[in-house]
Amino acid sequence: HDGFTLNDIVSYNTKHNIENGEGNCDGNDNNVSWNCGQEGTTSDENIIELREQQMRNLFTLLMISQGTPMFLYGDEVKFSKNGNNNTYCHDNKLNWFDWSLYRKNKRFFNFCKNMIEFRKSHPVLRRATFFNGINSDEYCSSDISWHGFEIGKPDWSENSHCIAFMLNGNKAVTGADLNDNN
């Protein structure tokens, strides 16, 4: 699969495809990534912790999003392709899976495993239909509601730094065998 790994999304601002032999002209230039203050690997503990937090944020967002979650092999153990987002031509460590990463990054692996279990245990996160946000007397509230600093008042402006949402886990809404409002 083309594109940055999860680890590379938080470690590189730009692609590093020089080793591909195409003058870094291959691969997408729009990676929607942020290196957290330093390009590539670092020993700066503050940057490392920020990157790990960003990876947890991104993985959480993926697990609470509707649809089928898709991530790249190795994302759960912080696999990196060193900023190369187009490794089609490599039969080397850029594409070989490093099994030692499970031991090295056990904390992040366990976080990912727990988030997958969380998703599996909450039917409201695996709906068969899209949200519509319409209030229904039958369910007492809409399937999704949006909030800001005040309940029921989301601020969609670009200066807002707070957004929250609530999902209705009523089994009649989710179509699941059990209520998910706990």
Task: Annotate the PLM regions.
Residues 2-182:
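Active-site and adjacent substrate-binding regions of carbohydrate-active enzymes
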